[in-house]
A protein has these predicted regions:
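Short, compositionally stereotyped local motifs that mark structural "simplifiers"
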Residues: 55-186
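Flexible, acidic glycine-rich loops studded with aromatic residues
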Residues: 1-99
Length: 187
């Protein structure tokens, strides 16, 4: 909402719209400018022109799929992160494994993945968290109607004896840049 609730109605009347910036120092080509601008400008238009009570991010994501087809038809070099698999996960204390969860913003899409293999022909359909008990590399991609829509996303998971363990430093570390008690684990 371009009119924050923290402002009074008197203050809100001075807001006449929204603004999207694209800093051009590192934009060397028109293709890269398009990549940086789309579909971000579509999201900006959604924020500006859709009434607050009608805003629905899931509906926007469904409509964005058709907008990509329109951008392709027009030859616009749009960013395809919408079609990338995202990695998440957490340690499962019950099974002593790290469970990787995959998701995508794209509705009605299928995620396919492979462990320790970038060969797309060996990808399996993702349906449940992936249990890892050792260091593993994972590749994943998003498919719509059997067609890969974005790039292949890759992540290395360093699962080892220390993963998921509670640990302390003894004696307590004294260096100033230590972040929340994290330090090198020996073993």
């Amino acid at each position: 909402n371009p009119l924050p609730e923290s402002l009074t109605p008197e203050e809100q009347k001075y807001i006449i719209g929204t603004q999207a910036n694209l800093w051009g120092e590192y934009v060397q080509t028109a293709d890269y400018l398009e990549y940086m601008a789309y579909p971000r400008l579509m999201a900006m238009a959604e924020v500006q022109w859709t009434d607050a009570e009608k805003k629905d991010v899931n509906n926007f994501h469904k409509r964005l799929k058709t907008q990509f087809a329109w951008l392709d038809k027009k030859g616009v070099h749009a960013c395809r992160n919408f079609y990338e698999a995202e990695f998440g996960g957490a340690w499962n204390n019950t099974q002593n494994v790290y469970e990787v969860k995959l998701k995508t913003l794209c509705p009605d899409a299928e995620i396919r993945y492979a462990l320790d293999c970038a060969d797309e022909s060996r990808f399996k359909t993702y349906s449940a968290p992936i249990a890892l008990d050792k260091e593993t590399e994972l590749w994943a991609a998003v498919y719509v109607d059997g067609k890969r829509m974005g790039g292949i996303t890759h992540k290395r998971f360093a699962v080892n004896k220390a993963t998921g363990c509670e640990y302390t430093c003894s004696p307590k570390a004294a260096w100033e840049n230590m972040h929340e008690g994290y330090a090198l684990t020996d073993g």
